[in-house]
């Protein structure tokens, strides 16, 4: 006699597993197409540049507006802790490493996941419900080659640029708060930052941002290409793309942070 609870659980898990499989397959095939087209000179660079510029225009100013409060909050919280233990000179090191390894890549993921993913899912979803995707296939044009791969490269390039911009603005805001509001000497701030922070921390930030951008675009493209039911279906796909993309970035960030802690020990002096 079958267990009804077991059957209901399988019915709920199976669609999610199938969707995950289609997303992984879309990501693998789009990546293969991207690499192959670049190697053979068939990649539509013009489309990729247009998409990259679009992502820059919709995320650059929000990145600055998001980075400054993050830097201020980090400086206030860390400053109060370091002051209580008599280690004001360590504010630059602690704040800088936290910004580079965690704050900046996650902030870039939020921006790309909010603005970039919604734009990709909305555009591809609108084309899907208008049967433009089917028309491309009828004409022998691969939608993944024509639409997904350029956006994949564009976001993968723009995401680390946003992360670096957030790092610069957040550290600058944190520095100003530390020296103007907490009495930290500017020399000791930068000395501790330069002593404990390294190029490896910045590289981790850039790699994280690239992975997050890649993940967000693949999820958004999958939701857009599978949109059904007219405008309502497009809206549902956009909402799902944003939520799933950001949640996926959070989960991946935990995994990457654990791997970094295991295999890349911090600098000790």
Segments the model singles out, each with a brief description of its role:
Residues 145-153, 245-264:
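Hydrophobic alpha-helical transmembrane segments of integral membrane proteins
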Residues 160-164, 168, 198-214, 242-251, ...:
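Hydrophobic transmembrane alpha-helical segments of multi-pass transport and channel proteins
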Residues 126-149, 230-234:
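Short cytoplasmic-facing helical segments at TM-TM junctions of multi-pass membrane proteins
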Residues 2-48, 223-228:
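Short, membrane-interfacial amphipathic segments enriched in basic
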Residues 91-134, 162, 219:
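Hydrophobic alpha-helical transmembrane segments of multi-pass membrane transport proteins
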Residues 77-100, 168-210, 219-240, 260-269:
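Membrane-interfacial helix-loop-helix connectors in multipass membrane proteins
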Residues 56, 60, 64, 103, ...:
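Selective transmembrane-helix segments that form parts of the transport pathway or gating/packing helices
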Residues 51-107:
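Active-site cofactor/substrate anionic-group-binding motifs, chiefly glycine-
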